[in-house]
Amino acid sequence: MLNKEQLQTIIKLQAELDLKIVQTKMIEESQDVLTAKFLALLVEIGEFANEQRCFKYWSSKPASSKAVLLEEYIDGLHFIISIANNLKLNLSDLKIVEQKYDNLNLAFLDLFSETLALAKEKNLSIINQWFNIYYTIAKLCDFSGDDIFNGYLDKNKINHLRQEQNY
C-alpha cells in the first residue's frame, strides 16, 4: 500500500486540484458538492468493478488489463481523498488492515456499503474501514503502492490539464 509520504503527497495534490476546480468552475463549496462527490465515488467504484468483471458470471471475457484496472482504481482514490479533504479527516492516522474476502464481489459490495455509510456518518473510523477494503482490493488486483502512487500522479496531471482545457 501507499507509504505515509506517498499518502501525504496525494492528499496535498488532491487539495490543490480541488481548489483549482473550485476556482476554475467558480463553485461555492457546499453540501451539494460533497453529495456529488459521494455519487461520483460510487460511480467510479462501479466502473472499476465493471472493468474487473468479477460479477459477470454469464461472461467468459477476462478482466480488463492491469493498466485499465489501475486507472479505474485511481479514479476512486481521487474522489475518496477529495471527500476526506472536504470532511477534514486526517488520513495520516489510518490503520490499514488487510481484509479477508472469498471473492472480489464481496469486497466490492462492502466497499459500496462503506461508501454509503461514510456519506451518512462522515467519520474517520468508517473511512478507515473503507481504506481497509480498498487496500485489500488493490492487493487482489496485484497493485503495488508504487503502482498506485505513480498512477495517481499521472491521473492528477491529466485532471489538471482537463481543467485548463475547460473540461
Language-model segments: residues:
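Flexible "arm" and connector segments at domain edges
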Residues: 1-167
